[in-house]
Amino acid sequence: MVEQSKVPSSSLCPPDKIIFDEERGEYICTETGEVIEERIIDQGPEWRAFTPEEKEKRSRVGGPLNQTIHDMGISTVIDWKDKDAMGRSLDPKRRLEVLRWRKWQIRTRIQSSIDRNLAQAMNELERIGNLLNLPKAVKDEAALIYRKAVEKGLVRGRSIESVVAASIYAACRRMKMARTLDEIAQFTKANRKEVARCYRLILRELDIEVPVSDPKDYVTRIGTLLSLSGITMKHAAEIIEKAKNSGLTAGKDPAGLAAAAIYIAALLNDERRTQKEIAQVAGVTEVTVRNRYKELTQELKIQIPSQ
């Protein structure tokens, strides 16, 4: 059935009996078979969407919103190529004029204190995200968390760097991206203690729920960076699963447990890596790897072949 407003007024067929044939571009009466109107141009999209999110994603009207840009990418930008619409280079006088326009355009984009804060924060977030090789989805989540923190006034009296780092860590935890607080803190001016304090504040004030970190989430990343085989990584995951069942993981740093499991699995599969190598990649200390190694081998009765 088609909408009443779309039915030709000259038709005697009841509106609920009229259908639209998309392939032929015709309005047809289902009772009589009469072609009421033909050669209709369908002005709707050729794609289908079943949810508002899908509709927004597939729509080609305007650019997509980008959480990692302070104004979400909805403002215009004057190109730096200094060329006209025909692709010809501008003369020096015109180039200076465009330069002045560009400066004023940038100033109008960042007017309020919140705009300046977001502009600085999004640049910092993009920088840290690139250094950590985070996917766009995680960076978008971190940007959304930071924006909520700004709306709540949580940034006031705190450094932008520490709140950005805390937002990134919260996003990583929410999306099960294996990154430790130490890894993130090393790429920012803020110290680890300050980032941890901001992280706890964000969780409490924004009522954000994060899943408990699973040591197995760290195994693939650590193993890949150490160029270990899939068999060794699978063995490490099995060791962690046994440790969970034995209650050895409660209250322990997941990165440290994953590092120790990787160390044990590498020894058992003759892909030896030093504790120092593994500790550096996992972002933990050698002492942590050594202590977790002793606990796992003793409690799980794992026999390590003599070196």
Swiss-Prot record:
UniProt keyword Transmembrane helix present: no
Top-level taxon: Archaea
GO cellular component, one term: transcription preinitiation complex
InterPro entries xrefs: Cyclin-like_dom (IPR013763), Cyclin-like_sf (IPR036915), TFIIB (IPR000812), TFIIB_arc (IPR023484), TFIIB_CS (IPR023486), TFIIB_cyclin (IPR013150), Znf_TFIIB (IPR013137)
GO biological process: transcription preinitiation complex assembly
Signal peptide residue numbers: none
Sequence repeats: 123-206, 217-298
Keyword annotations: Repeat, Transcription, Transcription regulation
UniProt record similarity statement: Belongs to the TFIIB family.
Task performed by this protein: Stabilizes TBP binding to an archaeal box-A promoter. Also responsible for recruiting RNA polymerase II to the pre-initiation complex (DNA-TBP-TFIIB).
NCBIfam families: PRK00423.1
The protein's name in its UniProt record: Transcription initiation factor IIB
Provenance organism: Sulfolobus acidocaldarius (strain ATCC 33909 / DSM 639 / JCM 8929 / NBRC 15157 / NCIMB 11770)
